[in-house]
Amino acid sequence: MTLRLLFLALNFFSVQVTENKILVKQSPLLVVDSNEVSLSCRYSYNLLAKEFRASLYKGVNSDVEVCVGNGNFTYQPQFRSNAEFNCDGDFDNETVTFRLWNLHVNHTDIYFCKIEFMYPPPYLDNERSNGTIIHIKEKHLCHTQSSPKLFWALVVVAGVLFCYGLLVTVALCVIWTNSRRNRLLQSDYMNMTPRRPGLTRKPYQPYAPARDFAAYRP
């Protein structure tokens, strides 16, 4: 009789422990190409039956509370986030979905869902799951977009400088050609300029004394 009572007691406690355990299912890995992600936590319990508190934790030891929301079957939960994160959420009978945005590479980590049933008693929470590794990929799009812009900017600057240098060279050549032509014309004008009129020098004639014709008169 005593053994039978002991067996019934152990069976009762095992049923109670099993009933008080809430299992949670999470995706093992989420790879994020953008800066947003939705993480769904499915529980083996009807969430609408009680007032609950749903939380999302970051880290192997669940050190950082990322997002938390309180709700029940009469009103939607109000989610609030850690200062480092931006989050919102939604729920149905067995699922709580956390939405995170403005994520960066340093947010890559393992995340755990937790559910706590606050009222009516008894207090219940879920068994620790294996968690979800959220991997945020580093963006290279900005670099690939900025490189062509930088390239074309350099091309435009080089083109402007080339055109400016070409114009300056042409202008200097024209100025040099005109200057050289003017010097040649001035030299020709100087050679063709007539001399100023003056006294002309008479040709030299040898001296011959004038004859006195009166002396020969009779």
From Swiss-Prot:
Modified residues (Phosphoserine): 187
Extracellular side: 20-150
GO term, biological process aspect, one: phosphatidylinositol 3-kinase/protein kinase B signal transduction
GO molecular function, one term: protein kinase binding
Localization of this protein: Cell membrane
Residue intervals on the Cytoplasmic side: 178-218
Name this polypeptide is given: T-cell-specific surface glycoprotein CD28
Gene3D superfamilies, per the entry: Immunoglobulins
GO-annotated cellular components: external side of plasma membrane; immunological synapse; plasma membrane; protein complex involved in cell adhesion
Disulphide bond pairs: 41-113, 67-87
Family annotation (PANTHER family): CYTOTOXIC T-LYMPHOCYTE PROTEIN, T-CELL-SPECIFIC SURFACE GLYCOPROTEIN CD28
Residues with PTM Phosphotyrosine: 189, 207
Record domain Ig-like V-type: where: 29-138
Membrane topology, record value: Single-pass type I membrane protein
Domain of life (superkingdom): Eukaryota
Post-translational modifications reported in the UniProt record: Phosphorylated by LCK. Dephosphorylated by PTPN11.
Gene: Cd28
Quaternary organization: Homodimer; disulfide-linked. Interacts with DUSP14. Binds to CD80/B7-1 and CD86/B7-2/B70. Interacts with GRB2. Interacts with PIK3R1. Interacts with PRKCQ.
Reported function: Receptor that plays a role in T-cell activation, proliferation, survival and the maintenance of immune homeostasis. Functions not only as an amplifier of TCR signals but delivers unique signals that control intracellular biochemical events that alter the gene expression program of T-cells. Stimulation upon engagement of its cognate ligands CD80 or CD86 increases proliferation and expression of various cytokines in particular IL2 production in both CD4(+) and CD8(+) T-cell subsets.
